[in-house]
Amino acid sequence: QPRSRGLGDVYKRQALISLSDLLTDWELILKRVRKCADADMVIALYNPKSKKRVDHLKEALDIIREYRDAQTPIAMVKNALRDGMDYRISTLDDVDYDFCEMNTTVIIGNSQSYIKNGKFITPRGYKL
């Protein structure tokens, strides 16, 4: 499972947002991203990229950067719980956009999130 592979327990206050604008207006999606970033939520983005939507993830992360430190952890999980699963953990200032594709989930930490021993951690209120 992704948690056991390096993500740790990242969820405390979280939001799950699709970046697909096929059925939802892009401006509404960006509004949701902004509201969740402002609320300091851990944000999971899915459907981040397609052949036609190559810049949606960058645009969403640019908004999140307005509210988060450059060292905020970010995880990209490709093919979660499927054959060929792979993941990368980095920070908002070191995003590997080439790793991302349609079947990638992108998780952005909140102000309490950090990376320790290669693990992405968002504490739930007690000391680890």
Question: What do these predicted ranges mean?
Answer:
Residues Q1-L7, Y11:
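Single conserved hydrophobic/aromatic residue that forms the stacking wall/gate
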Residues G8-D9, L30-V33, Y87-D94:
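Short, surface-exposed amphipathic charged segments that create phosphate/polyanion-binding patches used
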